[in-house]
């Protein structure tokens, strides 16, 4: 009898421990939360990862303090779904279904408001396809430009992919893209020309690189553009004060992490700006109306400024915001500042208390988003966030699954089976030492 009581006590204790672990991620109380903050990651022989990744992603988005620690151990084998699909012979319909592309407009509003995208494809094909899968809609149109020196294998895979979609095409011109060089700006303008000549009647165009990922759904982006901007361009930036207008030998104003602020010039003008333009400075990211794009492609001031921009640093950070300050430009916002949240940016100076999760810094002094950033990231008003290659892969996985879930929840049409991502999987993981 004594042995039986001991066994029962052991079973009860085991059950309590299991229940505690189950609730540890989901809803810790104040005492548990305090203990989590002080706890150090352990290295058990085997980690119970549960239904991966949805349970863990949910805990990360909810800000459970134990979740990033558990994520250190729960890393399944690298997903090779995208390259496998591109290598497998088959028709394009099978490719779209296999990669879970949404193939119908999800609402009448979206179907009647086409967006265009100019996308710089990185050399990481999987990251690019995941971005395109998230922002893809059959009523939208996508122009892809890549470095002309990209590997032939990458170019071939890219061509195979875009050939399966009538609304995705490669730019008619290629550039040797460098970060601080006119070639990036020229590549985007080349794509815009292709988009204007395409049969798609798009309303706005936005630019992305393959390392970015949407925080907002297509429906949410359209709602913000239509209700807040109402035919205006979005070019966040700043114009120098009237008493500090740059002259020859001076540079344009430098964007500052502190919105609506102006800092000293950082570039030297070899020549005065054409047409006596006042050079503004801001984000290289934009949302532009079709009429404004047509203006950029034909107006002498825009053409002359493009030629003049060859001699300045990071011209893409000055070109769009300067032209959008011209009062006679279609959709212009002459008095705008940093309004318009296109890309989320966390500056290194902001990575203090309450801004945890900054795991690295890129060359532009901005933080790379980590697992600890997810709760705050999804609450930002920005449309997109940059996911550097050094980011934890789970950051992109969680954002992708959340984005697809929200898109289908907002849909006004019944979802097709292939729009859903594969069911969750349950596995144990050997810790990574």
UniProtKB/Swiss-Prot annotation:
It is a single-pass type II membrane protein. Residues 233-275, 413-433 are annotated as: Disordered. Its EC number is 2.4.1.-. Residues 26-433 are extracellular. One of its GO terms (cellular component) is Golgi membrane. One of its GO terms (molecular function) is glycosyltransferase activity. It is found in: Golgi apparatus membrane. Its main location: Golgi. Keywords: Disulfide bond, Glycoprotein, Glycosyltransferase, Golgi apparatus, Membrane, Signal-anchor, Transferase, Transmembrane, Transmembrane helix. The chain crosses the membrane at residues 9-25. It holds the Pfam family Branch. One of its GO terms (biological process) is protein glycosylation. It is an enzyme of class 2 (transferase). Residues 258-275, 421-433 have a biased composition (Polar residues). Disulfide bonds join 57-209, 143-358, 164-191, 367-398. Pathway: Protein modification; protein glycosylation. Belongs to the glycosyltransferase 14 family. PANTHER family: BETA-1,3-GALACTOSYL-O-GLYCOSYL-GLYCOPROTEIN BETA-1,6-N-ACETYLGLUCOSAMINYLTRANSFERASE 7, GLYCOSYLTRANSFERASE 14 FAMILY MEMBER. This is Probable beta-1,3-galactosyl-O-glycosyl-glycoprotein beta-1,6-N-acetylglucosaminyltransferase 7. The gene is Gcnt7.
